[in-house]
UniProtKB/Swiss-Prot annotation:
Species this protein is from: Rattus norvegicus (Rat)
Gene (UniProt): Tnf
Descriptive protein name: Tumor necrosis factor
Annotated function: Cytokine that binds to TNFRSF1A/TNFR1 and TNFRSF1B/TNFBR. It is mainly secreted by macrophages and can induce cell death of certain tumor cell lines. It is potent pyrogen causing fever by direct action or by stimulation of interleukin-1 secretion and is implicated in the induction of cachexia, Under certain conditions it can stimulate cell proliferation and induce cell differentiation. Induces insulin resistance in adipocytes via inhibition of insulin-induced IRS1 tyrosine phosphorylation and insulin-induced glucose uptake. The TNF intracellular domain (ICD) form induces IL12 production in dendritic cells.
Site (Cleavage): 34-35, 39-40, 49-52, 79-80
Cysteines paired by S-S bonds: 148-179
Compartments where located: Cell membrane
Residues bearing the modification Phosphoserine: 2
Keyword set, alphabetical order: Cell membrane, Cytokine, Disulfide bond, Glycoprotein, Lipoprotein, Membrane, Myristate, Phosphoprotein, Secreted, Signal-anchor, Transmembrane, Transmembrane helix
Amino acid sequence: MSTESMIRDVELAEEALPKKMGGLQNSRRCLCLSLFSFLLVAGATTLFCLLNFGVIGPNKEEKFPNGLPLISSMAQTLTLRSSSQNSSDKPVAHVVANHQAEEQLEWLSQRANALLANGMDLKDNQLVVPADGLYLIYSQVLFKGQGCPDYVLLTHTVSRFAISYQEKVSLLSAIKSPCPKDTPEGAELKPWYEPMYLGGVFQLEKGDLLSAEVNLPKYLDITESGQVYFGVIAL
């Protein structure tokens, strides 16, 4: 073999070596990318499974027995307070309107779906609080009428007569009018209905008196049970 041939072979070998090295590097790069993609997909799949089956992640949302979530801190607080005591020994009252009373709102406890328990009492149309504590107070009324010969303004109020300072104060109140201020003369006398619901949580003292009143009892619809009521629940 001549010297020129040997030199030519060496040059060809030097030219082929970078190509082989480049091909090897490309193969390694593809292998690394493939491995990284596989690990990424596997990790995401594993994380999804763990979250889906509740192995990791935040605690599941608490729910009421009827399936409604506890969406407020107040509801969570009330639930914790209620569960910390035996509900059977808590003061509770639910009174209903006397449908035989004419043009007045009289509360009765000796009726179906009404009760006084664990120290609660009804005296002079007022509920008597038996012990200091946090109480849920609620009341609903339903007004009805026929047409609007005059401007009608309806009010519904829950009040507390505090034993500590001997004064009656309003705890909850609502005002509504079923009629426009200006009723056209000769307008058709259409029937109307106006419900009002009040509810709130209050710190009460033993001996406090609670009352639920309306300004125009003649418009009350008390023909059906469950439409007008007043209640207190210790929390």
